Structures are given as C-alpha cells and as structure tokens.
Curated annotation (Swiss-Prot):
InterPro entries: 2-oxoA_DH_lipoyl-BS, Biotin_lipoyl, GCV_H, GCV_H/Fam206, GCV_H_sub, Single_hybrid_motif. Binds 1 lipoyl cofactor covalently. Disulfide bonds: none annotated. This is Glycine cleavage system H protein 2.
Length: 128
C-alpha cells in the first residue's frame, strides 16, 4: 500500500504537486509511481526558465525496468530543479515525497491544483 500525504495534490499520471508558501509549486512522483518503476537510475530534469502548460512532458525518469515521462501537473515556468537527483536518483525510490524533481512558478496555481486529485481521490484512482 502506498503512502499518500494528505497535503499533496496528484495528477492521474502519478506526479504530486505541493503549493509552497512563496507561491511556487513543487513537483515529484508518487510512491505508487516509484514502486511501479523499480530502481530509478537516471532523471532527466527540465531546463530552468522552460514554460509548460499543465500536462506537458517536463522530463524523464529512467529505472532498471523502463523510462517514464514526467508531466507538469500545473502550468508555469520552471524556477528550480533538484540537481541532487543527478548524483542520487535513487532518492526518488527511498523518499518519493521529499525528493522533489522541479519547482514551477505557476500561471494559475489555484485553478490548476483544483483540477488535480486530492489524496483520497488519488488513492481511489490507484485502486487502494
């Protein structure tokens, strides 16, 4: 059973989003996603300054089993990436909710976040 923090919002494509106090949105992959992927060996991060619409491909997570696209759950500009994933991509397996991938300055955070699933909705979507 996956650990699903109540304070996060989730895309059906298994990314999580957290609205920060400074108005940015932090993005990562869910515990369910990392379990399905297996051991993560590489993360292709988006470029700082890149602008995404909600649902755009923002990067790639590669594991020993497969490569999977990462989608931006909200529209906005990438303002920070987690460079530590270059040296330790496996932290997405061990700490999926603290090992974030990128941060976005959202175009309309409230509207985009409202379209995402809450923890209970995500739990239902993954059959838990």
């Amino acid at each position: 059973m996956s650990n699903i923090p109540a304070e996060l919002r989730f895309a059906e494509s298994h990314e999580w989003a957290r609205l920060e106090a400074d108005g940015t949105v932090t993005v990562g992959i869910s515990d369910h996603a990392q379990e399905a992927l297996g051991d993560v060996v590489f993360v292709e991060l988006p470029e700082i300054g890149k602008v995404f619409a909600a649902g755009d491909v923002a990067g790639v997570v590669e594991s020993v089993k497969a490569a999977s696209d990462i989608y931006s759950p909200v529209a906005g500009e990438v303002v920070e990436v987690n460079e530590a994933l270059g040296d330790s991509p496996e932290s997405l397996n061990s700490e999926p909710y603290s090992a974030w991938i990128f941060k976005v300055k959202p175009a309309s955070a409230e509207a985009d976040l409202a379209k995402l699933l809450d923890a209970a909705g995500y739990k239902g979507a993954i059959g838990e």
